[in-house]
Amino acid sequence: MAKTPTRKKSKKVIIDGIAHIHATFNNTIVMITDRHGNAICWSASGGSGFRGSRKSTPFAAQVTAGSCGEKALAFGMKNLEVRVKGPGPGRDSAIRGLNAQGLKIQSITDVTPIPHNGCRPSKKRRV
């Protein structure tokens, strides 16, 4: 039986992208997309080896953003626009982690959804 010729997988080269940082109180998720919103790579604190309460630390966010930045560099990415969502402790350190990988950050935008008196918030914690 003759072998069919296999096509070599063409590697996408994307220079500009958007880094979406979703920082909650329990976790930090970093996702890098192209300009159209198609996902290129993503990383979360749990996937970077942090478990439990250590997932919510700023250091975990920095390591997570660094690993996602490495994957983006493999696609030839150079420039990033950063969009931060959420009130978590890993907001600033995730941006530092992306910057440490050598990616040029063009702008930082806060896209945290703010309700105009929408849903009723959950009850206050009594500790």
Curated annotation (Swiss-Prot):
Keywords for the protein's UniProt record, in alphabetical order: Ribonucleoprotein, Ribosomal protein, RNA-binding, rRNA-binding
GO annotation, biological process: translation
Keyword Cell inner membrane: no
GO MF term list: rRNA binding; structural constituent of ribosome
GO cellular component, one term: ribosome
Matches recorded under NCBIfam families: PRK05309.1 (NF003698), uS11_bact (TIGR03632)
Family under the similarity heading: Belongs to the universal ribosomal protein uS11 family.
Complexes and interactors: Part of the 30S ribosomal subunit. Interacts with proteins S7 and S18. Binds to IF-3.
Role description: Located on the platform of the 30S subunit, it bridges several disparate RNA helices of the 16S rRNA. Forms part of the Shine-Dalgarno cleft in the 70S ribosome.
PANTHER family: 40S RIBOSOMAL PROTEIN S14/30S RIBOSOMAL PROTEIN S11
Protein name: Small ribosomal subunit protein uS11
Protein's organism: Ruthia magnifica subsp. Calyptogena magnifica
Originating gene: rpsK
